[in-house]
Amino acid sequence: MFNIKLDPNESIHDQIISEIGRLISLGILEPDEKLPAVRETAKELGISPNTVQKAYAALEKSGLIYSLPAKGSYVSSGGKAAETVRNEAAEALRAAMRKAAETGVDRAAVDDIADEIFGKKL
C-alpha cells in the first residue's frame, strides 16, 4: 500500500511516517480509513513489526492517526491531520531553503528543484 523504497539515507521509521503523512495530506488516505495492520505492513516491507509500531505510535502522537484497541489504526478525522502535515512540511521546507541559501545554492537552482518536484513551469 505504501510507496516506500527503503532509502538508506533515511530511517525506515521516518519513511513510514513521511509516506503516511503524504497520503493523508493528499487526501489519498481519508478520515477514518483503516491503515494496514502493523504485521501486514512489516511483512510487505520486510522489516520488524516493532519499526512499524513505533512509526504508527509517532503518527498517533502527532494526531494524524488514532488507534482502537484490538481493531487497528485509523486516519484522524477532520482537516487537522492534513493541516498538521502541511505545516510540518512547510517548516521542513523553510529549514531546507535556509540551509541552501547559507551554502550558496542560488534561486535558479531552487526553482529548478521545485519544477522537478511539482512539474513543469506554467
Which residue stretches match the model-derived regions?
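A short alpha-helical element within helix-turn-helix/winged-helix DNA-binding domains
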Residues: K34-L45, L59
